[in-house]
């Protein structure tokens, strides 16, 4: 079965907004520091999903964002191949949701030089580097087995 989702990196110029997934029961991401995002709803475009998920999880309103790439995660959850649209947001407004109102985890602005020190999925360290380095548009595939990265490849598309 196919699952479509967005991954959204929010950048304030010196930090990325990450979520420490520490609130949701039976969460595949439990304990990890990840970007915000989520599953596309019926009839929703990736752009609409990204904007909705960012608002729901952070209360920030996206003014402009860049479509950075697509990542495939075959069989990431049992029986589900995940296809994720990756966005980077630099232009936003609003006030960050309070910790008590956040349902999935604790949000934190993480300085660029500390992003790679946070515990997360092995492949996410690669994505963090691409986002921080403003890499060209990419198509990637990360294969996990029992939460371990066992294969990966990426193609960057130069402008």
Swiss-Prot record:
Subunit structure, interactors included: Homotrimer.
Q: Which domain of life is it from?
A: Bacteria
User: Can you tell me which family this protein belongs to?
Assistant: Belongs to the Nudix hydrolase family.
* Database matches in InterPro entries: Mutator_MutX_prot, NUDIX_hydrolase-like_dom_sf, NUDIX_hydrolase_CS, NUDIX_hydrolase_dom
Q: Which GO terms describe its molecular function?
A: 8-oxo-7,8-dihydrodeoxyguanosine triphosphate pyrophosphatase activity; 8-oxo-7,8-dihydroguanosine triphosphate pyrophosphatase activity; metal ion binding
Cystine bridges? none
Motif annotated as Nudix box, chain positions: 38-59
Keywords noted in UniProt? DNA damage, DNA repair, DNA replication, Hydrolase, Magnesium, Metal-binding, Mutator protein
EC numbers, comma separated: 3.6.1.55
Electron transport in keyword set: no
Q: By its UniProt entry, which Pfam families does this protein fall under?
A: NUDIX
What cofactors are annotated for this protein?
Answer: Mg(2+)
Name the catalysed reactions.
8-oxo-dGTP + H2O = 8-oxo-dGMP + diphosphate + H(+)
Binding positions for Mg(2+) per the UniProt entry: 38, 53, 56-57
- Report whether Nucleus shows up as a keyword of the record: no
Q: Which one GO biological process term can you cite for this protein? A: DNA repair
EC class name:
hydrolase
The Gene Ontology CC terms held by the record are: cytoplasm
Lineage, opening ranks: Bacteria, Bacillati, Bacillota, Bacilli, Lactobacillales
Which ranges carry the Nudix hydrolase domain?
Answer: 1-133
Q: What is the name of the protein in this document?
A: 8-oxo-dGTP diphosphatase
């Amino acid at each position: 079965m196919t699952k479509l989702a967005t991954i959204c990196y929010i950048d304030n110029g010196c930090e990325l907004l990450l979520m420490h997934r520490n609130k949701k029961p039976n969460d595949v991401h439990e304990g990890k520091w990840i970007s915000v995002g989520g599953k596309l709803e019926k009839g929703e475009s990736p752009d609409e999903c990204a904007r909705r998920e960012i608002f729901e999880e952070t209360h920030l309103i996206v003014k402009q964002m860049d479509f950075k790439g697509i990542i495939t995660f075959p069989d990431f959850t049992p029986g589900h191949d995940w296809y994720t649209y990756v966005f980077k947001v630099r232009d936003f407004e609003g006030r960050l949701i309070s910790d008590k109102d956040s349902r999935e985890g604790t949000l934190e602005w993480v300085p660029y030089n500390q992003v790679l020190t946070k515990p997360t999925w092995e492949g996410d360290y690669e994505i963090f580097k691409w986002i921080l380095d403003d890499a060209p548009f990419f198509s990637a595939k990360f294969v996990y087995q029992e939460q371990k990265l066992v294969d990966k490849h990426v193609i960057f598309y130069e402008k």
